[in-house]
Amino acid sequence: MNAPTIDRATFDALKDTTGAEFALELVDTFLEEAPSMLADLRDALAAQDADKFRRAAHSLKSNCNTFGALTLGAMARELELTHVSKVPGSGGQPLAPLADEYSRVAAALTALRHE
């Protein structure tokens, strides 16, 4: 069985802790900034810049876990712990699975935002 794209308990806890309105502002900010985080990962991978790669993966991981995007967070954590020179390829696009999962997360967060 696949894990849900967004862990609803984590997302609801965020809303309870911060208030629904602020949680939705955080969602909007994440949806605006996450593509830059993914671009930073791609750029760092292309440049073999280990420090930038680790920082970008860490930022993505932390943000994902805040919203309950646990699968994407785990993928980012795996990248954070993997040296940039050891990132496995995937048909020449090693970050494609991460980008695909982000697309699912963005769609799920957008749907939750409009509930």
Each PLM stretch: what is its role?
Residues 1-115:
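Two-component system phosphorelay core
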